[in-house]
Amino acid sequence: MLPPQQPIHAELEHGRRTSAGSHAAQLARSPSMSLSPRSQNQSLPYPSSRPGSAAGSAHPFGYDPRQGTLSPVLSARRTSEDQPRPTSSSSASGRRYTEPASQTPAPAPLGSSAYRPRHTSTPGNPSSAYAPRFTPQPTTTPSSPSTSQHTPYTPHHSAPPRILHYNPHRQSAPSSVLRPIYPDEVAHLRQLAHANNPLRQKPAARRYSYSGGRAPEPTPTPRTSLPGENDHSYFPPQWDDRPSMPPSEVSYGGPPSSTPGAPPSGYSQYPPNWEAQTPGGNWDGERPGRLGKRRARDEEDDEYERNKRVVSGPVAGQAYSKKVTVVAEHYNSRPEVGVERREFSPIIGLKKFNNWIKSVLIGKFAYRPRGKVLDVGCGKGGDLNKWKQARIALYVGLDVADQSVQQAADRYRRMPKPGFDAFFYAHDCFSNPLSDVLSPELQIKDLYDNVTMQFCMHYAFENAAKARMMIENVSRYLRRGGIFIGTIPNAELLLERLNELPDRDEELRFGNSCYSIQFTERRHKGVYGHDYRFYLTDAVEDVPEYLVDWENFVSLASESGLRLVYKKAFHEILQEEKDSRDFGPLLGKMGVLNEYGESAMDADQWEAANLYMGFAFEKM
């Protein structure tokens, strides 16, 4: 039987081709036999190395004892006792081969062909996560006595993990919580629970004032800074930190109180003590059944109908000056045309733009949620919906024109679910204190979060007494941190237009097809009483108005603890807010711009709009 085929090595093949010697005879084989070494169940009679490896090419008869004891998969693993050996550059698996001790290992080739074996699980590598695996192989006798002997491998085990005993840091020695609760402790805990449970509390004793209303709760803690950017959204977030209750169970939501004196029973306490209310809405502390609640609401309706009165005129003894009477009669004579007919106004674009300006001021400076608003010069209630968007809790409107106040109250009654309580009074707020007309629960000092005067404050600068009374009414009822907002004619711009008139012009009139302004004198001594006649198409019919000296106004406000925080002309407000997230879309929603982005105002209306400016003061 012929011997099995000998592996072909690179060096031997080269020698056979270059010289014809003993190697040629040694490498000769029969072409009729082709047997694989794996088919013979016996060891080979001569040493062998893996064909194609670097070690086999350089040393064809080298022998590694580990080749017979380790499996081919783990043949590249070396023990901790072996010296490092060069790796094969042609083997993709990174296996290692032991060279004869008498031979010098060939250096590994450098360059792109140099192979760096990947990290495998070897006994010498402590970071390995796999244990060595042995495969039994037939034992062979080494052909060379100089071959190093293989030391049996002993698996290396890592040190056991360190065990940390549970020993937490204690403030005190551990003790048991299983201790008896004595009867006196139980009684004490029940007493505390009863005192803290609003469902078990008895109604608080009512303190009646001369008007029959209950004394209100103190005003909430004032804000120490201006509203933040998150508070400026004209459409506030739909959340509230108070318990949700049906509006009809919190306070009576019927027609507003529009006269001074005792309010209906539903307003027995104002401002309502929201913190003392229970989720059921029984804000007097009692817990009646469903029938009792229905009967209570019916009684409130009956009592309101008995006590309902029309909006009163000026209080007894209140004297109006001649010019104030002219202003009141003018606005009383203006009919309420409604939203539908208003669209046919020749200055509808200007009116919508002014409403947008007021929406910006309210959206930027309204206190949320559940703010309290004092509207001086409320007119016909044109801003009720704007304040509704701000989710206020209380609205008090005052105006010198009693017919306008009546129309404002009617507008509030027609509002579907206004969400706030409203009170309306006819009163000259620039000549008399508000305490002459407000009910006691509404004239608490520092009660209101916002005071607003839209297109009316300039009437107060007829003289120093009226201007100081106006500032006093604002400062007295505006809480610390509250904001006073308003819109007035730009006196500096009006004086510039007046000075542009030629000296020979004795009429002192300027304007356009939309408005006209006529001064009574070119030069005026003092900062009060510089009057002019103002006409605006379909709005103002030749009414006396007064310039507001801005520096004097800021000085008066500073004396009353009001600090200026905002001042911009109308065109500046438009340029600043037209692209804002909150107020830019309102230009289209409120009709200032049409679907094509075109303004409803013509050039004359735009000139009239730029005569005004907006402001905001914070009470310090």
Swiss-Prot record:
MRNA binds at N354, N355. Keywords: Methyltransferase, mRNA capping, mRNA processing, Nucleus, RNA-binding, S-adenosyl-L-methionine, Transferase. It holds the Pfam family mRNA_G-N7_MeTrfase. GO terms for biological process: 7-methylguanosine mRNA capping. One of its GO terms (cellular component) is nucleus. S-adenosyl-L-methionine binds at K358, G377, D399, D428, Q454, Y459. It catalyses: a 5'-end (5'-triphosphoguanosine)-ribonucleoside in mRNA + S-adenosyl-L-methionine = a 5'-end (N(7)-methyl 5'-triphosphoguanosine)-ribonucleoside in mRNA + S-adenosyl-L-homocysteine. GO terms for molecular function: mRNA 5'-cap (guanine-N7-)-methyltransferase activity; RNA binding. Its EC number is 2.1.1.56. CDD domains: AdoMet_MTases. Residues 345-620 form the mRNA cap 0 methyltransferase domain. Residues 29-44 have a biased composition (Polar residues). Residues 45-60, 136-157 have a biased composition (Low complexity). Residues 1-176, 193-304 are annotated as: Disordered. The record marks K380, K386, R411, H458, E545, Y612 as: mRNA cap binding. It is found in: Nucleus. Responsible for methylating the 5'-cap structure of mRNAs. Belongs to the class I-like SAM-binding methyltransferase superfamily. mRNA cap 0 methyltransferase family. This is mRNA cap guanine-N(7) methyltransferase. It comes from Cryptococcus neoformans var. neoformans serotype D (strain JEC21 / ATCC MYA-565).
